[in-house]
Amino acid sequence: MADGGSERADGRIVKMEVDYSATVDQRLPECEKLAKEGRLQEVIETLLSLEKQTRTASDMVSTSRILVAVVKMCYEAKEWDLLNENIMLLSKRRSQLKQAVAKMVQQCCTYVEEITDLPVKLRLIDTLRMVTEGKIYVEIERARLTKTLATIKEQNGDVKEAASILQELQVETYGSMEKKERVEFILEQMRLCLAVKDYIRTQIISKKINTKFFQEENTENLKLKYYNLMIQLDQHEGSYLSICKHYRAIYDTPCIQAESDKWQQALKSVVLYVILAPFDNEQSDLVHRISSDKKLEEIPKYKDLLKLFTTMELMRWSTLVEDYGVELRKGSSETPATDVFSSTEEGEKRWKDLKSRVVEHNIRIMAKYYTRITMKRMAQLLDLSVDESEAFLSNLVVNKTIFAKVDRLAGVINFQRPKDPNNLLNDWSQKLNSLMSLVNKTTHLIAKEEMIHNLQ
């Protein structure tokens, strides 16, 4: 490295002018011996003088050894003030070599892990974060120190401060950091943002992770952590279709597929959330794809429930509750229930949403088989009041799921979509052409018959 040149703090690449390796080899053992005798201040002054010579001569290896030796002696003597002071001093020296500072910071990072005294640890972290601020060549060390600081803050109950500290890091721009470690940092940022209920920032941070990364080897734990965090986020947003997709990703993970209990719970959640999602083309497509999964045979109740929503028949809510209520909310000894319809506020809300999906399914079936129906008859089929039925119908019309027009005075709903004038004209023209062709053919046949009879 020394032969190839070293980089100074101002960005200049310099070549080693004098090799101080022999001098440093001789001086360091002497200094270590003196430091153990309690003459630390004297030793540091000697080493600082030697450091100036090695730095001026651009001897990166020797400078690194001296910087590491200084902080090591301060640490072993437990002179914490002196340690922090020398870290600041050595990193700010004129034309300091970047590689030497990096070596010193890396050495100090090991001390952070070893120190048990919290105030001392926090002060050392603050010093190192100050030294590494804005320096690309020690960005990984700064990121790790920041993560350690955030963990300490969280353990002390200051989750908001922990989230704020960790958000400072833009680790997605750290090219020198391994992809796996980058993802770990981003997941930690997401977790802390969720802990302080900062859902918008969590959504922004989540987009920094490319899900293709989870196709690589040894990423299953990170994949599960990511999708569980995304489920928490989308549960707050009430986006059931997204939650269904997240559970499908968990279900498709090899380590989940390997354990029967885990994949069954994941598949149950997939089924329930796809049913809870409002009807649209994407939801309908996903329902049919999930229905084709052969593993549904092993959880028959959930398979039958999903089939109800793909069959073009009306459902009665009371019958559904009677047949599936206990299984969905409490489970059985063979198939434990999921937390989708738990006894919490969120679970009760999802249960109400399930009833809404049943009603919406029934209205779509009516729109398919009826052209006109009275409000009273529709309310009777839905087991709802007229006002409730009208509210559900209006919602589906607004979302363009179905077409309907309500004649309130007559109390009649018309599901027949009015035809476009151009289409009507085209149909009339086509039918007229067909009629004229038929008349022409008939006239021709009559004339033919007359000619045959005249000949006879």
Swiss-Prot record:
Keywords: Acetylation, Isopeptide bond, Proteasome, Ubl conjugation. The modification N-acetylalanine is found at residue 2. InterPro entries: PCI_dom, PSMD12-CSN4-like_N, PSMD12/CSN4, RPN5_C, WH-like_DNA-bd_sf, WH_DNA-bd_sf. Component of the 26S proteasome, a multiprotein complex involved in the ATP-dependent degradation of ubiquitinated proteins. This complex plays a key role in the maintenance of protein homeostasis by removing misfolded or damaged proteins, which could impair cellular functions, and by removing proteins whose functions are no longer required. Therefore, the proteasome participates in numerous cellular processes, including cell cycle progression, apoptosis, or DNA damage repair. The lineage of its organism: Eukaryota, Metazoa, Chordata, Craniata, Vertebrata. Component of the 19S proteasome regulatory particle complex. The 26S proteasome consists of a 20S core particle (CP) and two 19S regulatory subunits (RP). The regulatory particle is made of a lid composed of 9 subunits including PSMD12, a base containing 6 ATPases and few additional components. Interacts with ERCC6. There is a cross-link at residue 92 (Glycyl lysine isopeptide (Lys-Gly) (interchain with G-Cter in SUMO2)). It comes from Mus musculus (Mouse). SUPFAM superfamilies: Winged helix' DNA-binding domain. This is 26S proteasome non-ATPase regulatory subunit 12.
